[in-house]
Amino acid sequence: MRPAEDIIKRPYITEKSNAEIANGKYTFIVDAKATKTEIRQAVEKLFQVKVLKVNTVNYKGKRKRLGVHEGFRPDWKKAIVKIDTEPKPVTYLTEGGKTATTTKKYKTSIEEFGAAQ
């Protein structure tokens, strides 16, 4: 597997993406070849959060001109990641038949996101 820093390039900050932070949705520009599973693992590793859902969108590069010269902007991929903002404790049975409860082991927001709430 590739390093998480190679998969997540940078946050994608717009008015809409900033509004979605309140709902636990964070938007990133990711490597164009990254899969949803790789994106999930990279976000969980980099930010110590629990990822519930990953949506991706592929964008084609736009055609740009400078006088008679023509070129293309690169293709890119956007990932919208929904994190668990209210983790519930998990209860399970131990070997002795007793019940044990785990507390949350991960964060409920990404403070390093840039223009956070």
From Swiss-Prot:
Gene: rplW
Pfam family, any one: Ribosomal_L23
Alphabetized Gene3D superfamilies for the sequence: 3.30.70.330
Domain of life where this protein originates: Bacteria
Coiled-coil blocks: none
Known role: One of the early assembly proteins it binds 23S rRNA. One of the proteins that surrounds the polypeptide exit tunnel on the outside of the ribosome. Forms the main docking site for trigger factor binding to the ribosome.
GO MF term set: rRNA binding; structural constituent of ribosome
InterPro entries assigned: Nucleotide-bd_a/b_plait_sf, Ribosomal_uL23-like, Ribosomal_uL23/eL15/eS24_sf
The name this protein goes by in its record: Large ribosomal subunit protein uL23
Organism in which the protein naturally occurs: Acetivibrio thermocellus (strain ATCC 27405 / DSM 1237 / JCM 9322 / NBRC 103400 / NCIMB 10682 / NRRL B-4536 / VPI 7372)
Biological process terms in GO annotation: translation
